[in-house]
Curated annotation (Swiss-Prot):
This is Phenylalanine--tRNA ligase alpha subunit. Signal peptide: none annotated. It comes from Trichlorobacter lovleyi (strain ATCC BAA-1151 / DSM 17278 / SZ). It catalyses: tRNA(Phe) + L-phenylalanine + ATP = L-phenylalanyl-tRNA(Phe) + AMP + diphosphate + H(+). Its cofactor is Mg(2+). Tetramer of two alpha and two beta subunits. Its main location: cytoplasm. Gene3D superfamilies: Bira Bifunctional Protein, Domain 2. CDD domains: PheRS_alpha_core. InterPro entries: aa-tRNA-synth_II (IPR006195), aa-tRNA-synth_II/BPL/LPL (IPR045864), Phe-tRNA-synth_IIc_asu (IPR004529), Phe-tRNA_ligase_II_N (IPR004188), Phe_tRNA_ligase_alpha1_bac (IPR022911), Phenylalanyl-tRNA_Synthase (IPR002319), tRNA-bd_arm (IPR010978). It is found in: Cytoplasm. Disulfide bonds: none annotated. Its EC number is 6.1.1.20. The gene is pheS. Keywords: Aminoacyl-tRNA synthetase, ATP-binding, Cytoplasm, Ligase, Magnesium, Metal-binding, Nucleotide-binding, Protein biosynthesis.
């Protein structure tokens, strides 16, 4: 058995030396040291030897097993190190190569305008107020002095949900809710989404508005003009011309449309401004006394003004966008310009 053990030892050492990968070394391990391995078989055969030879032969078998196992482990570690070194050599990072830039998103032009308008009015002492988009008829129409027969109540203009609930057609209901909760003075803007049954190059069934309200004692039309002139000059530039034209809104009296000098032609007249030199940007006026009565304010002691603008229209004028539908198409080629 001694000769057989030495022969097996030499064979195992030769097999280990010939192995170049972890897989080959594992095969050698199984062949000699596994449950059915050759060295394991010798250990099981010790029982057939005379009793006086068993300890010596058993010690020799264990010595060979330890030697083979240690050499396999040593060779395995060396094979792993060589494989790692080879992989590192082929996967080496060239730190001189330029880095890959991350794709950066940008804010939507509507969001940019809302933030800029809100910041301007914050500087004028206005705070932001919000309200529900599904609104009750009373807040959206009646409290704002819209009589039941007013055309804005027609199905072609308003999305009715059920009974007296509807999708708000403007953010004016936020003004009503604020005045019902808060006594004068009031100075708020109400940005938000509104809905109307209309869709073409300059209209959308869903769009955004910012409306404003200022209520206090002795608020005058001159205050309204001063606030809006300051706003337009900050938004479009200090040299932007501003004019107010008489108009009509059920919830304000007197009412006005606010125009700015055409941002395309500078007021000289072009296709965009229809040769007038002016572009309408918002509506405004002094709050009608009837609206104050609806919210429990005394129109004899307080006064105020309100104004409202479409954010998409402001964005189109500010960024030179010709079709409002571009703002809702989610075309990255368009949006990444902002």
């Amino acid at each position: 058995m001694r000769e057989q053990l030495e022969q097996m030892r030499q064979q195992a050492l030769s097999a280990i030396a010939a192995a170049t990968t972890e897989e080959m070394l594992n095969e050698v391990r199984v062949r000699y040291l596994g449950r059915k391995g050759e060295l394991t078989g010798l250990m099981k055969g010790l029982g057939s030897l005379p009793a006086d030879e068993r300890p010596k032969v058993g010690q020799l078998v264990n010595t060979v097993k330890d030697e083979v196992e240690a050499l396999i482990e040593q060779t395995m570690n060396r094979a792993r190190e060589e494989a790692t070194a080879k992989r590192l050599a082929t996967e080496r990072i060239d730190i001189s190569l330029p880095g890959r830039g991350r794709r950066q998103g940008s804010k939507h032009p509507v969001t940019l305008v809302i933030e800029e308008v809100s910041e301007i009015f914050a500087g004028l002492g206005f705070s932001v107020a919000e309200g529900p988009e599904i609104e009750h008829d009373w807040y959206n129409f009646e409290a704002l002095n819209f009589p039941p027969e007013h055309p804005a109540r027609d199905m072609q203009d308003t999305f009715f949900v059920e009974n007296e609930l509807l999708l708000r057609t403007h953010t004016s209901p936020v003004q009503i809710r604020t005045m019902l909760k808060q006594k004068p003075p009031v100075r708020i803007i109400a940005p938000g989404t509104v809905y109307r049954c209309d869709s073409d190059a300059t209209h959308s069934p869903m769009f955004h508005q910012i409306e404003g309200l200022m209520v206090d004692s002795q608020v005058s039309f001159a205050d309204l003009k001063g606030i809006l002139t300051t706003f337009t000059n900050q938004l479009f530039g200090q040299k932007t011309g501003v004019r107010l034209r008489p108009s009509f809104f059920p919830f304000t009296e007197p009412s006005a449309e606010v125009d700015i000098a055409c941002v395309i032609c500078g007021g000289s007249g072009c296709r965009v401004c229809k040769q007038t030199g002016w572009l309408e940007i918002l509506g405004a006026g002094m709050v009608d006394p009837e609206v104050f009565r609806h919210v429990g304010y005394d129109p004899e002691t307080i006064s105020g003004f309100a104004f409202g603008m479409g954010i998409e229209r402001i964005a189109m004028l500010k960024y030179g966008i010709s079709d409002m539908r571009l703002l809702f198409e989610n075309d990255v080629r368009f949006l990444k310009q902002f």
